[in-house]
Swiss-Prot record:
Record-stated family: Belongs to the herpesviridae portal protein family.
One Gene Ontology cellular component: virion component
InterPro entries, per the entry: Herpes_Portal
Annotated region described as Disordered, given as residue ranges: 633-697
Coiled-coil ranges (or none): none
Species name: Human cytomegalovirus (strain AD169)
Superkingdom assignment: Viruses
Keyword NADP: no
Gene Ontology biological-process entries: chromosome organization
Keywords carried by this UniProt record: Host nucleus, Viral genome packaging, Viral release from host cell, Virion
Subcellular location: Virion; Host nucleus
Skewed-composition ranges (Basic and acidic residues): 664-689
Complex and partners: Homododecamerizes. Interacts with terminase subunits TRM1 and TRM3.
Protein name in the entry: Portal protein
Amino acid sequence: MERNHWNEKSSGAKRSRERDLTLSTIRSILAADERLRIKASSYLGVGRGVDDEAVIDIFPTGQTMSFLRLLHGFLGTCRGQSMHQVLRDPCVLRKQLLYGVCKTLFDTITVRRVAEEWKLHAALFPYRALDEEDLEQYLLVWSASLRQSVQTGVLGALRDILYQYADNDDYGLYVDWCVTVGLVPLLDVKTKPSEAAERAQFVRAAVQRATETHPLAQDLLQANLALLLQVAERLGAVRVANAPEVRVFKKVRSERLEAQLRGKHIRLYVAAEPLAYERDKLLFTTPVAHLHEEILRYDGLCRHQKICQLLNTFPVKVVTASRHELNCKKLVEMMEQHDRGSDAKKSIMKFLLNVSDSKSRIGIEDSVESFLQDLTPSLVDQNRLLPARGPGGPGVVGPGGAVVGGPAGHVGLLPPPPGPAAPERDIRDLFKKQVIKCLEEQIQSQVDEIQDLRTLNQTWENRVRELRDLLTRYASRREDSMSLGARDAELYHLPVLEAVRKARDAAPFRPLAVEDNRLVANSFFSQFVPGTESLERFLTQLWENEYFRTFRLRRLVTHQGAEEAIVYSNYTVERVTLPYLCHILALGTLDPVPEAYLQLSFGEIVAAAYDDSKFCRYVELICSREKARRRQMSREAAGGVPERGTASSGGPGTLERSAPRRLITADEERRGPERVGRFRNGGPDDPRRAGGPYGFH
């Protein structure tokens, strides 16, 4: 039975409502926490600029940085390394842009515009003669002047634009990235409205300045002003990254190559993708990566040669090594000598202990006998020393010196003693001599032991000094590991005395006495400098083979076979220049420059582009049409003259033939202006004479 409260609601209903409210609150808190966590993680992810996916660093690393250093001569430079300077020549890009823009400009001309230019010229300078040779010369002069005017105006405008916006090292940096890492980080530059207006003003001013006296060239450039502005804008809108904050990496999971500059993603052009066949490591397929190991080997040999040249200048050098086996042998000898039983110090100590323990005369005699017997058993005559304790046992000395007693009744005769005190003096003298001898031997043994310990101490002291030098050297190498390459490179540029000092500090030599515990390992009695010529020739051949086979550069030689120059080929333009033009500058509509034109000057390239364009064809068409029209007019003017084979008024049977017309060969038509200096009737024909074909009066 439920208990009702004063507000007429049961306690169970109240608890249910509170439980629902609590659960709703908990759900709201969890949902808010989830949203906050998602937002925080996304915010932190954006702030870092990199997600949690594992990456493999490509640049900068020790390997890729060494690629760039050795590419520009900081490591292992040789003669063949100049091949790279041919490839990164910025004039190639400028000539490519010049040819492509000129070809596009000249192809945009119309035949109507060329015809109008001809009509204007014909109206100002009409042709009144009917001679075909004079007409041809007239047309050649007009076409040559038109050609020169257009080429001069176009060349002046494009030269100013290219040297203003293409006079940087972006193309060289692009080539450096291609041959080292194979990846080119690109930075898109945002153009401000003021910069765009300034660029447009510069282009218009360049066109106006170059075509003030060339109206047709001015009309042509004004009609293609959008193309000129596009070229100038694209040249300034893209930069090859050249900063220490550049980072290039590859994501492991998505296998994407990315680049960053100061934490922001930038565009990346892939020229040669690294191989990812090894875990957490990439293999580069660029030319410099192929030459890297050989270049480092050659550079190490050059540094070794320089150090040998600086250090090996003393008359004699000796390299010594420790003879540890001799030290061990000495230790063993000392131990054996220490363990000998005939040690003088032990004998004296033993004798003193025995004497102190003796309580009677017999004990003292036994101690003396034992002491003397241990030291010099072969020198002591026991019978003379102790007659009563001879080897035959105790006996009685009879009259005449006979000894009665001993084994088997042995009777011996002894020489008569010199006096009653002779045995006692012999024992005292012998004992005194033996004690002095023991003391001398003890002193000598201590001196020898001190000398041996001193020698051993010197040996270990030298060994400790060597170990300390090694530790100091290793510690200095570890501290200078980052600046080791720069320090070694300084040896090539420092003065000789300073370089010698640095080399001696890096590899010090000190005089060392060759003691008993050292042996000579090697010696130098003259200066030794290793040669690098063979390895340099080999490395030069590697550079040339790698670049010639990769980019197919072309070698120009003289008639004697000597090398004259190394230039781009058509394949090189397609392999290196066109990708930069299409993928980076976005100017793929421009025609590629032929390899024969890359050796020409700017003026010759403009002339070659004119010859390959529709402009030249339209001018030839106008000239051919005018020649045909003049021939038609000549035939119409000669209509009253009888044709060939008809009788004239001169009488029957007489034929008046028209003068044979001289035919112009194709070679003479191609030479054109070379026929100006011709002769007629024995004298030069001046086209500017009065009543001439050009209408000058």
